[in-house]
């Protein structure tokens, strides 16, 4: 597998709709203010977080069960910022919609700006022929409230292309998160 460059990412986004909307350069500032960078980079694409959050709360004293997840465990927030309580987490989604080619696996890594503040971003790999908005999980590992900024960079996608296409893709398997839009909760 080889990691793909900015030229390949740009071509796949513009000619094949791999990333929509696509920002073809690295954005570091907007309207004379600093932002956490997003857009294409040398060997990846920095995604933005949409202004749609689900913040975990345990007001119902529920047990977290991935096979039977209780939607009431989250508070919905639509805002340019999201405050995550200490030692808690929030779900969000990317601004960008992805269409992954059949011979590509995409790995997501959190941005160091957030990691250096104790905020960890987790996303499982985007499998061949998966498409949708990426659901992002932010863990606040600190004992203080933590802030996430919508419409700014939160994670980097790395695109790894295989020397041959897989026999069975995520789409072929009828993956349960195929075509997801918005923040998607666990499905068992």
Swiss-Prot record:
Subunit structure: Homotrimer.
InterPro entries the record matches: dCTP_deaminase, dUTPase-like_sf, dUTPase_trimeric
Name of the protein this chain belongs to: dCTP deaminase
UniProt EC number: 3.5.4.13
Catalysis performed (reactions): dCTP + H2O + H(+) = dUTP + NH4(+)
Pfam families: DCD
Active site: 137
Keyword Iron-sulfur: no
GO MF, one annotated term: dCTP deaminase activity
Keywords carried by this UniProt record: Hydrolase, Nucleotide metabolism, Nucleotide-binding
Binding site for dCTP: 111-116, 135-137, 156, 170, 180
Keyword Hydrolase: yes
GO BP annotation list: dUMP biosynthetic process; dUTP biosynthetic process; nucleobase-containing small molecule interconversion
Entry similarity comment: Belongs to the dCTP deaminase family.
Primary role: Catalyzes the deamination of dCTP to dUTP.
Pathway: Pyrimidine metabolism; dUMP biosynthesis; dUMP from dCTP (dUTP route): step 1/2
């Amino acid at each position: 597998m080889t990691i793909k460059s900015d030229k390949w990412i740009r071509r796949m986004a513009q000619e094949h709709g791999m990333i929509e909307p696509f920002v073809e350069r690295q954005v570091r500032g907007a309207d004379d203010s600093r932002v956490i960078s997003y857009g294409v980079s040398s060997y990846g694409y920095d995604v933005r977080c949409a202004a749609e959050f689900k913040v975990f709360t345990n007001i119902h004293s529920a047990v977290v069960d991935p096979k039977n997840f209780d939607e009431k465990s989250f508070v919905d927030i639509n805002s340019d910022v999201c405050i995550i309580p200490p030692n808690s987490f929030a779900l969000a989604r990317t601004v960008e919609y992805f269409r992954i080619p059949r011979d590509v696996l995409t790995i997501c890594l959190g941005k160091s700006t957030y990691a250096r503040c104790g905020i960890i971003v987790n996303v499982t790999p985007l499998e061949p022929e998966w498409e949708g908005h990426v659901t992002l999980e932010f863990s606040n590992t600190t004992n203080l409230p933590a802030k996430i900024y919508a419409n700014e960079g939160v994670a980097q996608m790395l695109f790894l292309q295989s020397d041959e296409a897989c026999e069975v893709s995520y789409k072929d398997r009828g993956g349960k998160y195929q075509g997801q839009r918005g923040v998607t909760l666990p499905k068992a």
